[in-house]
């Protein structure tokens, strides 16, 4: 098999993003990267490492602390024929660019009667740990799911991170590309060649017949581990990664729910008015056996993101609580069953700062 098509190698999530960016920039001169610290030696957790030395500062543009201006430059240049990749190292501070994202990027194609395209990607990094607390740990993907004209994608695996970024850069619409810091060192098999992971197509990561578990972003890793714990209790969980949140593949989820009769949605965000609420609503509207389906949602506790490790452990859903909730949902009541789940060997706590 030619080297360019190798599929058996294992690389990290961050390396997959870096590789996709490098290959796209080499293939298409209209692709460029801009953001705060994109040329830093640490390379935004390794995702932009060595890009500046390879492509120059005209295509890897370090920007000042001005999120609104950064995003405005991206939206304007995309309308002029470029394909910018904006890097916002903290999703929290994308709030400073909401006018550019919502009133300009998302609406220009419609407002100009289809004459204008806005092919820009906004890499928005979310996460937790290292005591980042209220203003540096928020997951705000649900905000952007509410806006017509924006696409939202949140890949979990290195394979899907590379393919989803390629699809996002090639798309003619603005895309919010959500990535979790604690996934950056997550390893998986990734082909060397360029390929696309399409929007609106979920991936079944584990098949099962007793319960459907849908996990978003980093929560998916915990869901897989929870499914293994449930298997030890003779419960077969089907685990689905939506990957694309807007548009979302409701058909794959509904087909699974009609088979299992139980649905647990685990969001990497707050549950009120969030992605889990949207998924549950879509299932209610589309599933054929509503009266026989039991559903439950899990997500962040509905309080401000905490700083201390003790509170973080209570705040974020983990595999133990996911398995316990899934088991009790199937049984139709609270039980005394306790899952046997070991500490995650796949994910490292983020140790900061960049």
Regions found by a protein language model. Give the residues of each.
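Thiamine diphosphate
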Residues: 1-174, 178, 339-354, ...
């Amino acid at each position: 098999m030619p080297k360019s098509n190798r599929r058996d190698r294992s690389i990290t999530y961050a390396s997959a993003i870096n590789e996709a960016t490098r290959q796209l920039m080499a293939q298409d001169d209209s692709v460029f990267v801009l953001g705060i610290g994109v040329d830093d030696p640490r390379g935004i957790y390794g995702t932009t490492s060595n890009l500046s030395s390879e492509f120059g500062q005209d295509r890897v543009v370090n920007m000042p602390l001005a999120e609104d201006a950064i995003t405005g430059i991206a939206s304007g240049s995309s309308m002029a024929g470029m394909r910018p990749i904006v890097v916002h190292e903290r999703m929290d501070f994308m709030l400073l660019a909401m006018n550019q994202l919502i009133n300009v990027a998302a609406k220009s194609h419609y407002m100009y009667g289809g004459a204008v395209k806005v092919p820009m990607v906004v890499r928005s990094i979310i996460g937790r740990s290292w005591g980042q607390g209220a203003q540096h740990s928020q997951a705000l993907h649900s905000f952007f799911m509410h806006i017509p004209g924006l696409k939202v994608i949140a890949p979990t695996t290195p394979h899907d991170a590379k393919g989803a970024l390629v699809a996002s850069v090639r798309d003619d619409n603005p895309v919010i590309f959500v990535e979790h810091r604690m996934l950056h060192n997550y390893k998986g098999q990734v082909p060397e060649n360029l390929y696309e992971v399409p929007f609106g197509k979920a991936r079944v990561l584990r098949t099962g017949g007793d319960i459907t578990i849908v996990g978003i972003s980093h929560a998916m890793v915990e869901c897989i581990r929870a499914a293994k714990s449930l298997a030890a209790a003779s419960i077969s969980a089907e685990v689905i990664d939506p990957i694309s949140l807007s548009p979302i593949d409701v058909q794959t989820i509904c087909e699974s729910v009609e088979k299992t009769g139980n649905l647990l949605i685990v969001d990497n965000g707050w549950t009120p008015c969030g992605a889990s609420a949207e998924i549950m609503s879509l299932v209610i509207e589309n599933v054929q056996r509503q009266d026989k389906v039991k559903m439950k949602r899990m997500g962040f506790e509905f309080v401000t993101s905490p700083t201390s490790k003790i509170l973080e452990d209570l705040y974020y859903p983990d595999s133990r609580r996911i398995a316990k909730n899934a088991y009790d949902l199937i049984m139709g009541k609270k039980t005394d069953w306790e899952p046997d789940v070991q500490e995650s060997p796949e994910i490292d706590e983020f140790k900061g700062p960049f």
